């Protein structure tokens, strides 16, 4: 088994977007007794509504990582957003959590968006994984099945965050009220607005409204 600890990458096969599940568990993540509440949730399935205990364990690990990837006050802002804003915000946390998602997004998706062809397919992502494999022994050690699953998971994340059309696989920008982008601008995270596939003139327009 190739050593993972030197690689910045992890597989993303264990947990997809899971918007509603994350929404339900957020109060447990923010609670002062978070650890004991999450342990109880894994055992008793009070809020997650996920039948398998193995899945609950896996999801809780990933939800904790996503929660910790951004400042705690972000989640206070998040709770007051529209559903579309919350979906975008969860995608922001996912980008901050998983380097593979970040690289897929900036090396493949955004290049596609800035080209003539806005269709994003699994093959586009597999090409990026091949590039990563050439420079990262841990990624290179993944089975073809794992690589395919990572690509499928990323595409699911895009669809559920509002960036990829379910039927056509066409990329689509996330358009929100200016107020829902305020956190990113005021926190020096304007790059995320580019990740939402907004053009510079759209970003400037949003800034003038704040």
Predicted features along the sequence, with ranges:
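Non-catalytic, well-ordered alpha-helical scaffold segments
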Residues: 19, 23, 57, 61, ...
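Long, low-complexity intrinsically disordered regions
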Residues: 109, 113, 133-139
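DNA-recognition alpha helix
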Residues: 121-137
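Positively charged, polyanion-binding regions of nucleic-acid-associated proteins
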Residues: 89-92, 96-119
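Accessory, usually C-terminal, subdomains that scaffold auxiliary metal cofactors
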Residues: 140-210
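Leucine-rich, amphipathic alpha-helical/linker segments
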Residues: 8-15, 19, 25-28, 32, ...
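Catalytic DNA-binding helix-loop module of base-excision-repair DNA glycosylases/AP lyases
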Residues: 103, 107-109, 124-129, 157, ...
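Eukaryotic partner-binding/assembly regions in large regulatory complexes
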Residues: 1-88
């Amino acid at each position: 088994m190739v050593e993972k600890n030197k690689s910045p990458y992890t597989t993303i096969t264990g947990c997809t977007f899971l918007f509603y599940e994350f929404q339900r568990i957020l109060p447990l993540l923010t609670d002062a007794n978070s650890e004991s509440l999450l342990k109880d949730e894994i055992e008793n399935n009070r809020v997650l509504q996920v039948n398998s205990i193995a899945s609950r364990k896996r999801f809780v690990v990933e939800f904790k990582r996503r929660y910790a990837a951004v400042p705690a006050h972000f989640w206070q802002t998040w709770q007051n957003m529209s559903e579309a804003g919350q979906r975008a915000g969860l995608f922001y946390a996912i980008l901050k959590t998983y380097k593979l998602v970040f690289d897929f997004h900036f090396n493949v998706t955004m290049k596609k968006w800035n080209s003539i062809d806005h269709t994003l397919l699994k093959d586009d992502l597999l090409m990026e994984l091949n590039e990563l494999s050439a420079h990262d022994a841990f990624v290179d050690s993944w089975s073809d099945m794992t690589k395919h699953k990572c690509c499928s998971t990323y595409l699911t994340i895009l669809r559920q965050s509002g960036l990829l059309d379910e039927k056509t696989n066409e990329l689509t920008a996330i358009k929100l009220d200016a107020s829902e982008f305020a956190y990113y601008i005021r926190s020096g995270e304007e790059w995320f607005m580019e990740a939402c596939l907004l053009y510079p003139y759209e970003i400037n327009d949003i800034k003038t409204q704040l």
